[in-house]
């Protein structure tokens, strides 16, 4: 299993570009190629340290539904079969159990379920991925393959026509 925070652990700066991970060539994945690939701590929010100039609502926008859809597609294609999102359920840190560097009393992180129990848009994207896995159980037993050979095929120019109320217009590409 793996932990993965691909765009940043906190939302204090610009998001990192989401990479196509190529998990199938990662040494740890190669060593366990007949085992399920599980992201045990998958990014659901971003860290808000004490005294930061941003809060959980900024982190909610930082780690949004668009991120989840793209990240899920990349991981599904790479053979990841299970995700555990951290943290999917925001909460409150009571009783001085946290340290100042670990966050405010809020332990929300912009999670899919907010500290005040509201559903955020990204929860739908996570559920979509879960339903996708349920609909296609074959994903859990598929073997990876090498990248296909790309061929550059060129042909004649393409001509398209656009019909408008004023007549027919020709566009060449």
Functional labels for PLM-detected ranges:
Residues 40-55, 74-173:
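Carbohydrate-binding surfaces of carbohydrate-active enzymes
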Residues 1-76:
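Substrate-binding/catalytic cleft of secreted carbohydrate-active enzymes
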């Amino acid at each position: 299993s793996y932990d993965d925070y691909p765009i940043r652990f906190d939302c204090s700066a610009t998001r990192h570009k989401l990479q196509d991970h190529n998990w199938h060539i990662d040494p740890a994945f190669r060593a366990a190629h007949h085992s399920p690939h599980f992201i045990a701590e998958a990014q659901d929010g971003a860290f808000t340290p004490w005294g930061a100039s941003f809060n959980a609502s900024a982190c909610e926008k930082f780690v949004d539904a668009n991120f989840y859809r793209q990240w899920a597609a990349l991981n599904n294609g790479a053979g990841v079969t299970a995700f555990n999102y951290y943290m999917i359920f925001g909460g409150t840190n009571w009783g001085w159990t946290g340290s100042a560097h670990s966050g405010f009393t809020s332990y929300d992180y912009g999670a899919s379920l907010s500290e005040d129990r509201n559903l955020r848009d990204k929860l739908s994207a996570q559920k979509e991925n879960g339903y996708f896995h349920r609909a296609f159980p074959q994903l859990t037993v598929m073997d990876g393959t090498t990248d296909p050979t790309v061929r550059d095929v060129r042909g004649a120019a393409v001509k398209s026509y656009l019909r408008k109320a004023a007549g027919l217009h020709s566009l060449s590409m």
